[in-house]
Amino acid sequence: MSITLSDSAAARVNAFLANRGKGFGLRLGVRTSGCSGMAYVLEFVDEPAAEDTVFEDKGVKVVIDGKSLQFLDGTQLDFVKEGLNEGFKFTNPNVKDECGCGESFNV
């Protein structure tokens, strides 16, 4: 099982953590949402819980809860700029279907 980050995603997460002034790493998870069933959740974490799994890639610790891990295994997190917009992009090999707006997915 693994979660990987592109160079641009790692740089962006490290910049956010530096601006925040503290933090263990980035929590990546899923929640029920949208028309396709699930949506990604990103937040900073100061201390992982006992049931969390921690991955490290390019110096960034990525924390995933046990319920989300099965849906996120193999995911690559990227940070992209498209025109005037920028944000994190997920490449998840488990996704079977996405909603038209791109906000939610199903595995």
Curated annotation (Swiss-Prot):
Provide this UniProt record's keywords sorted from A to Z.
Answer: Iron, Metal-binding
Give me any GO biological process, just one.
iron-sulfur cluster assembly
Cite the InterPro entries for this sequence: Fe-S_cluster_asmbl/transfer, FeS_biogenesis, FeS_cluster_insertion, FeS_cluster_insertion_CS, HesB-like_dom_sf, IscA_proteobacteria
Q: Does the keyword Disulfide bond apply?
A: no
Reported function: Is able to transfer iron-sulfur clusters to apo-ferredoxin. Multiple cycles of [2Fe2S] cluster formation and transfer are observed, suggesting that IscA acts catalytically. Recruits intracellular free iron so as to provide iron for the assembly of transient iron-sulfur cluster in IscU in the presence of IscS, L-cysteine and the thioredoxin reductase system TrxA/TrxB.
User: What family name appears in the similarity comment?
Assistant: Belongs to the HesB/IscA family.
* Annotated protein name in UniProt: Iron-binding protein IscA
Tell me the organism. Klebsiella pneumoniae subsp. pneumoniae (strain ATCC 700721 / MGH 78578)
What is the gene called? Answer: iscA
